[in-house]
Amino acid sequence: MKMRRYKLFLMFCMAGLCLISFLHFFKTLSYVTFPRELASLSPNLVSSFFWNNAPVTPQASPEPGGPDLLRTPLYSHSPLLQPLPPSKAAEELHRVDLVLPEDTTEYFVRTKAGGVCFKPGTKMLERPPPGRPEEKPEGANGSSARRPPRYLLSARERTGGRGARRKWVECVCLPGWHGPSCGVPTVVQYSNLPTKERLVPREVPRRVINAINVNHEFDLLDVRFHELGDVVDAFVVCESNFTAYGEPRPLKFREMLTNGTFEYIRHKVLYVFLDHFPPGGRQDGWIADDYLRTFLTQDGVSRLRNLRPDDVFIIDDADEIPARDGVLFLKLYDGWTEPFAFHMRKSLYGFFWKQPGTLEVVSGCTVDMLQAVYGLDGIRLRRRQYYTMPNFRQYENRTGHILVQWSLGSPLHFAGWHCSWCFTPEGIYFKLVSAQNGDFPRWGDYEDKRDLNYIRGLIRTGGWFDGTQQEYPPADPSEHMYAPKYLLKNYDRFHYLLDNPYQEPRSTAAGGWRHRGPEGRPPARGKLDEAEV
């Protein structure tokens, strides 16, 4: 009898352990890449059975005339927010691999005098110096033969230990470039990089991978593509059919890829599709926020072919745009340490509201470090100190590199732009209702904060949703690093980001756009309230 009770007790214990193990196994399985095909059948079918995924706030009623709790009718009944039908999702862009090509661009030139000069940063010799006779044409028919451009060099003498004089050659740098080869930009020259004296040009350029999650920041994405398109070798862009809050959204970026909107950069874009929402993401928004970057990194890197360990990986938010010169330096030089960050100019609602300080977020390292130290997890790169990771010592011993975190730029020398909430009022509205449920207070839950007239008032004054009024003055459009060059050259399209559309035009004495010359003149400013695009 006792033996029978003992066996019955053991059976109940084993059944309980099996049930607990199954629950933990399923929860762990949902975070791995390979079961996403299974999860795509219904992202919340099984998870809603074990975990309560009910939203903290009531959902809007989809029926006409029903109560719209915490949502306005523009959002609740908009057909743009319904998932795409299967017929439009037939093209499997998210399964296509991208082969990284070799960069064959000749960035440096070797002179006869022994100098190695960075072409864009070195002053060219257009005329022979005084005292040198003009070169005679060597063409057979009297036409001058084409010769490669000449670069100015400066020769110096250094006294050796035994009194012998040694000559070496340096390039003559253009403003904004530094170093013996004129390839070190100002954002590196004035950074806290501890190994500046060890910087040397590479024989073969690295490839640069830029990873981004996108929701509806398509104008800023277009600016990124134009700003970095010639130095970045692969843009890994992740899009989900869920917002960060867990509600359905259309695959707008995939549509823009297929209809030719981004045809000029299509060959460099690797499309990543996140077709499920992580369990627990509705209750804790940071789970969803972190998982987006984890999935982006793991799925994206796994589909890059011809990848080398010393290639550069940079992960950004959609509103963070690194400066081209800094990214090009990482591509062309050896001797810098890792991981690295960018000091970015901070703006709110548009580049016209410049916030004090800089945004400094660790966002890049080599592919080797990403795999060995961070375990191919982009959120660890952005939020975890490398010395807290268990494998960083093994990585140092294997590579012989001492890991020292540094930042491109400084508080006085911006190495990029961070434009927060930089949308039209309608775009800010969509950001409010799409925001994850973890960064409290969640302003999208308040009906008055979603009012478009209220949002226009925030853009006009630079205020915040909590009612505070900032004291910083509007930025001067003539300042260096005011905005990316592509924006400045296309004022008519991006004027809502460059000039406050709800303020009176600045006078010429205030240094407004009339001082910018042909690069960015404003159009007629008759109706300020109709300035959205």
Curated annotation (Swiss-Prot):
Catalyzed chemical reaction(s): N(4)-{beta-D-GlcNAc-(1->2)-alpha-D-Man-(1->3)-[beta-D-GlcNAc-(1->2)-alpha-D-Man-(1->6)]-beta-D-Man-(1->4)-beta-D-GlcNAc-(1->4)-beta-D-GlcNAc}-L-asparaginyl-[protein] + UDP-N-acetyl-alpha-D-glucosamine = N(4)-{beta-D-GlcNAc-(1->2)-alpha-D-Man-(1->3)-[beta-D-GlcNAc-(1->4)]-[beta-D-GlcNAc-(1->2)-alpha-D-Man-(1->6)]-beta-D-Man-(1->4)-beta-D-GlcNAc-(1->4)-beta-D-GlcNAc}-L-asparaginyl-[protein] + UDP + H(+)
> What triggers production of this protein?
Expression is up-regulated by CDH1/E-cadherin-mediated cell-cell interaction.
Q: Which residues are glycosylated?
A: N141, N241, N259, N397
UniProt-listed InterPro entries: Glyco_trans_17
Q: Which residues lie on this side of the membrane: Cytoplasmic?
A: 1-7
Assembly, in brief, is:
Interacts with MGAT4D.
Query: What does it do?
Result: It is involved in the regulation of the biosynthesis and biological function of glycoprotein oligosaccharides. Catalyzes the addition of N-acetylglucosamine in beta 1-4 linkage to the beta-linked mannose of the trimannosyl core of N-linked sugar chains, called bisecting N-acetylglucosamine (GlcNAc). It is one of the most important enzymes involved in the regulation of the biosynthesis of glycoprotein oligosaccharides. The addition of this bisecting GlcNAc residue alters not only the composition, but also the conformation of the N-glycan.
Q: What is the protein name given in its UniProt record? A: Beta-1,4-mannosyl-glycoprotein 4-beta-N-acetylglucosaminyltransferase
The upper taxonomy is: Eukaryota, Metazoa, Chordata, Craniata, Vertebrata
